[in-house]
């Protein structure tokens, strides 16, 4: 268990120490939100309004909140997977640099090494994804807020599950 904790801590430290990888992972959700809200918000809104029945006309704030919710959902779905791939590049870097040979020589099982990469990638992805969630909730507060505390809890749970999926997918591919 100590070997797993030490390797996981090592992998997390290396991810956050690499400023380029960390900064890219952190700024990507913000850039995507700006691009989504700038270019896709009007397309979503027009599509949403055009598909409403004529006898039903919700207020502009409800439509804006619905469009914002769709944008945030797509942003979080994309970020939880792409950030997982970015944070899992550490495994590839260790293979390229030969550091994995040093790790495999140590008296630690291969499954422990693989699990440490997975856990470190999950922790790193969760931190970045929760930062993206904070940015997204700020955007929703700006364009229209109709969420309850239970909704926020379910969104947090969804982000956690999405990061598990993204990390598992990136670990499987790497």
What residue spans do the PLM features occupy?
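Residue-level recognition of transmembrane alpha-helices
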Residues: 7, 25-26, 75, 117-118, ...
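Hydrophobic alpha-helical transmembrane segments of multi-pass membrane transport/permease proteins
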Residues: 10, 14-50, 67-86, 122, ...
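Hydrophobic alpha-helical transmembrane segments of membrane proteins
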Residues: 62-93, 158-171
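Transmembrane helix boundary and interhelical loop/hinge segments in multi-pass membrane proteins
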Residues: 84-108
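Alpha-helical transmembrane segments and their short interhelical loops
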Residues: 110, 118-174
């Amino acid at each position: 268990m100590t070997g797993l904790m030490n390797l996981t801590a090592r992998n997390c430290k290396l991810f956050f120490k690499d400023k380029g990888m960390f900064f890219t992972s952190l700024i990507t959700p913000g850039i995507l939100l700006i691009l989504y809200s700038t270019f896709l918000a009007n397309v979503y809104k027009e599509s949403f309004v055009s598909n409403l029945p004529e006898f039903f006309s919700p207020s502009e704030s409800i439509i804006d909140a619905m469009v914002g919710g769709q944008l945030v959902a797509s942003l979080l779905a994309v970020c939880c997977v792409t950030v997982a791939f970015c944070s899992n590049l550490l495994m590839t870097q260790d293979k390229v640099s030969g550091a994995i040979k040093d790790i495999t020589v140590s008296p630690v099982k291969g499954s422990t090494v693989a699990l440490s990469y997975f856990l470190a990638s999950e922790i790193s992805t969760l931190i970045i994804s929760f930062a993206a969630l904070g940015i997204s909730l700020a955007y929703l507060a700006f364009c229209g807020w109709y969420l309850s505390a239970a909704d926020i809890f379910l969104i947090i749970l969804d982000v956690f599950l999405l990061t598990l999926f993204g990390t598992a997918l990136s670990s499987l591919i790497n």
